[in-house]
Amino acid sequence: LASRYDTAGTARTVTKAAGGQTEITGPYGWKIDQAAETAALMELVSSGSCWSEGQAQADREPVYSQKAASREGMDWGTTYVEVDLGGQHVYMFKEAQIVWDAPCVTGNVSKDYTTPSGIYSLTYKEKDRILRGKKKPDGTYEYESHVDYWMPFNGGIGLHDASWRSK
């Protein structure tokens, strides 16, 4: 089932807001919990509850370890943010329509803080956050920067304001 229905980690072709298509991957998407689903199926079969009046009862949702927004079309749904790394622009879509867009600067490549391409879900949103770089042997950090908002989507990578960056 997982090889047929999982979308997490798979390559997908998307049409960019600025035009053209690109292929993206990432951890976002549907992912069946194979161990739990196997156990659930074994229980259904052994208990006989998968049969009713001689008919197979196949309408059930698998056990997922991760769910996406939609099973139709783009599994991230119609409300999402697109960050165009090449064009250095961010777009906010609501119900498939652009409701906000702005220029942006992505990770500082010269300092090895690149922004990865891919599809991710936001982990949480936070205001007034201090972002810290790697911890140095003396216990201090490579950098400490205050941001007004922070929305991580891939570990220590996320969307935030960056008053110290202009390009």
Q: What are these regions, as identified by a protein language model?
A:
Residues L1-Y120, Y124-S145, Y149, W164-R165:
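Surface-exposed, secretory/extracytoplasmic low-complexity segments enriched in Ser/Thr/Asn/Gly/Pro
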Residues W150-W164:
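Glycine-rich, acidic and aromatic/proline-enriched surface loops and short helix-turn segments
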